Amino acid sequence: MSAAEEDLIDYSDEELATTEAPAPAAGANGGVKGDSGNLTVSGNAAAAKKGSYVGIHSTGFREFLLKPELLRAISWCGFEHPSEVQQVCIPQAILGTDVLCQAKSGLGKTAVFVLTTLQQVEVVAGETSVLVMCHTRELAYQIRNEYQRFCHFMPDVKIGVFYGGVPISKDVEVLKNPETHPHIIVGTPGRLNALVRDKYLRLNSVKVFVLDECDKMLDQIDMRRDVQEIFRATPPQKQVMMFSATLSQEVRPICKKFMQNPLEIYIDNETKLTLYGLQQYYIKLEEREKNRRLNELLDELSFNQVIIFVKSTVRATELDKLLRECNFPSVAIHSGVSQEERIKRFNDFKDFNKRICVATDVFGRGIDVNKINLAINYDLPPDADSYLHRVGRAGRFGTKGLAISFVSNEADQEVLKAVEKRFEVALPEYPEGGVDSAAYTKTD
C-alpha cells in the first residue's frame, strides 16, 4: 500500500502523556485570527463581565429551531431539556459562529457539535461536509455512535469513522465509492492525515471543522502538526469549533489561531471544574498495599460500574488478570490491545456485560458510559488536568459519583496538592467507616 500505511501515526498511551507547554501553532489557512469581537460566557450569568455574551437559556430544544428530524431524534433519545453549555452554544453555532468551549465533563459538549453539524450538513454524493477530529480511537468510535443516534431520522446522511489500527485499504474503499463516501467524517489525526496526504480523502468541500478534546491535540507537537496539515487541506472559509473540559490560558491563544472571532464559552470558572455530584477522596498507602485495598473497596462499595486507572499498559494487563482471578467481572482497555479487540471490550463494558474496566489514560478523556459511578486512581496521573478528565468519567450529566485516589509516594502527594490548588478544593481522606452509598448512587 502507500507510504501512509508504513508511517501511520498511532498515538499510544505514552504519547498521550502531558508534554511541555507547546510552541505557537504555525500559520494555517486564513492566517492568525484576532481577538476582537470575542464573546465570553461565565457559568454564572450574574457574574458575567460587561460586554460579555450571555446565552439564550432555552426551556427546550424546540426553541433552537432545529430540523424536525433532529427534534424527533432528540425526543427518541430521551432528552427533554438542553444543558447549560447546549443552551449557550447551539443558538450561535447553528448560525455558523466559530466556537471555543470549555465545560465540565459530562455536560453534553458532544451533543453541541453533533446537533449543530447535523443541522448544517450538506448531503452531496462523494463530498464531505463536516470533519470531526479527536485524539483516540475509542473517542472517535463513540462520537460516530452519537452521530448515528441523532441522525436516526436522517437516513440520507452517511457517517464515517477513520482511525489507526485497522487496514487503510478499508478506508480507501469507502472513500472511493460515492455511494458510501461519508458526508460527516470522524477520525484521529494520524489516519486522516495519511488519507489526505495520499489523496484518498479530499476536504475541499468541508464547511465545518471540529476538534474534540482540543487541548490534548494541540498540546502535543506531533498531533498538532497533523491537525495543521489537515486544516490546511480544508477551505479557508469554514466554521471551526473546539471543545474540552480543560482549556488552560496557554492553549487558548493556540486554539484561536484556527478561528475567526470565536464565541468563547467557559462554563464555570476554570478553577472550579469538578462535578457537583461527585464525591472525591484519597487513600494513603504503600505500593504493595494497593491490590488488597482495591479488593476491599470493590467488595464494600455499591457501584454500578467502575473504571480503574493505571499508568501503563503492563499494569493494566496484570491488574485485570488479577481481578479476574478474584472473580471480578473485569476487562482491560489500553493501546497494547488490537483495535478490533479494544472496540469489542469497550462495547462489552458500555453494554454492561462487564462492570469493571481497567484502563490507561487512553480511556481518560471524553469516553461516556452512563452507568459509571465509581472512578479509582490506582495510579495517580502526572497532572491536575488529567485527574479532572479521569474522575469526570463518574458522575456524568449531573448524576452522583465517587472518585478515590491511591496516594503511595511523594510524587502522588504533589499531584494531589496540584489538584487542590488548581481546582480550589480540599480532597479529604477516605473515611475509616467508608462512605454512605446514598452519596454516590442514584436514588429514585
UniProtKB/Swiss-Prot annotation:
Localisation per UniProt entry: Nucleus
Enzyme class, spelled out: hydrolase
Record domain Helicase ATP-binding: where: 90-265
Chief location: nucleus
GO cellular component labels: chromosome, telomeric region; spliceosomal complex; transcription export complex
GO terms under biological process: mRNA 3'-end processing; mRNA export from nucleus; mRNA splicing, via spliceosome; subtelomeric heterochromatin formation; transcription elongation by RNA polymerase II; transcription-coupled nucleotide-excision repair
Catalytic activity: ATP + H2O = ADP + phosphate + H(+)
Gene3D superfamilies, per database record: P-loop containing nucleotide triphosphate hydrolases
Domain of life: Eukaryota
Domain notes: The Q motif is unique to and characteristic of the DEAD box family of RNA helicases and controls ATP binding and hydrolysis.
Function: ATP-binding RNA helicase involved in transcription elongation and required for the export of mRNA out of the nucleus. SUB2 also plays a role in pre-mRNA splicing and spliceosome assembly. May be involved in rDNA and telomeric silencing, and maintenance of genome integrity.
Protein name (database record): ATP-dependent RNA helicase sub2
Species: Sclerotinia sclerotiorum (strain ATCC 18683 / 1980 / Ss-1) (White mold)
